[in-house]
Amino acid sequence: MYKIQLLSCIALTLALVANGAPTSSSTGNTMKEVKSLLLDLQLLLEKVKNPENLKLSRMHTFNFYMPKVNATELKHLKCLLEELKLLEEVLDLAPSKNLNTREIKDSMDNIKRIVLELQGSETRFTCEYDDATVKAVEFLNKWITFCQSIYSTMT
């Protein structure tokens, strides 16, 4: 009688592990990645708030889109990634001798790397954006709040 329950439990466990269900060690890694993402977003925000040249001042006029639904899950980070790619194109952050521009590029590269790691193999999510746009500082503040929320639910 207990054999069937035991076999069912084993089968369910194997199915969860095979489908990438979070384990305690992966949760710890996710927390570290979310914390790193949060720090990089905060660093980027500080650089954006204090532009030192005209090229960066264009960032303040750029309109960003936020997800239509309130971002509450890691899959929503795909929306952040898509908007950062657009910003990078607008700023044309090619290799530069300007330290501020290089630091912004490094922060954006770190953010993209971390988001890709957090997403893993999940590629099915499609971002739906709100019609209203926000400026760079508000955009980054909203994603910082998102990361803080995710981090606090994991602790």
Swiss-Prot record:
Residues annotated as glycosylated: T23
Q: What is its main location?
A: secreted
Return one Gene Ontology term, BP aspect.
leukocyte activation involved in immune response
**Which compartments is it annotated to reside in?**
Secreted
Could you tell me the superkingdom of the organism this chain comes from? Eukaryota
* Alphabetically ordered keywords of this record: Adaptive immunity, Cytokine, Disulfide bond, Glycoprotein, Growth factor, Immunity, Secreted, Signal
Paired cysteines (S-S): C79-C127
The answer to whether keyword Signal applies is yes
Gene Ontology CC terms, in alphabetical order = extracellular space
Task: Report the protein's function.
Answer: Cytokine produced by activated CD4-positive helper T-cells and to a lesser extend activated CD8-positive T-cells and natural killer (NK) cells that plays pivotal roles in the immune response and tolerance. Binds to a receptor complex composed of either the high-affinity trimeric IL-2R (IL2RA/CD25, IL2RB/CD122 and IL2RG/CD132) or the low-affinity dimeric IL-2R (IL2RB and IL2RG). Interaction with the receptor leads to oligomerization and conformation changes in the IL-2R subunits resulting in downstream signaling starting with phosphorylation of JAK1 and JAK3.
The protein's name is Interleukin-2
Gene (UniProt): IL2
